């Protein structure tokens, strides 16, 4: 089982999500990711991936798989904010790369 690290931005996004069913579905997908099942995920560049949750407005979770035992959840959003979220995820990942 892999370790999942959640950025503070991701934690705030998931906490502020009003749709409890969506939040539950996202947590299930993260659990599957932790178990090694990436499911509906696509690379978005710079070593990052987008996990698609086909529910509601099309939720997305952006993450970095370090290749070790750690996956970093960077941020989340939905289809309507996809391009801005990708830019934000890449910025957050660069900060983690510096650490």
Model-identified regions with their sequence ranges:
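A short, surface-exposed loop/turn module that caps and links secondary-structure elements
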Residues: 28-55
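Solvent-exposed, charged helical/coil patches
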Residues: 1-31
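Enriched for short, Lys/Arg-rich terminal
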Residues: 3, 12, 23, 38, ...
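Secondary-structure transition/hinge residues
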Residues: 18, 34, 97-99
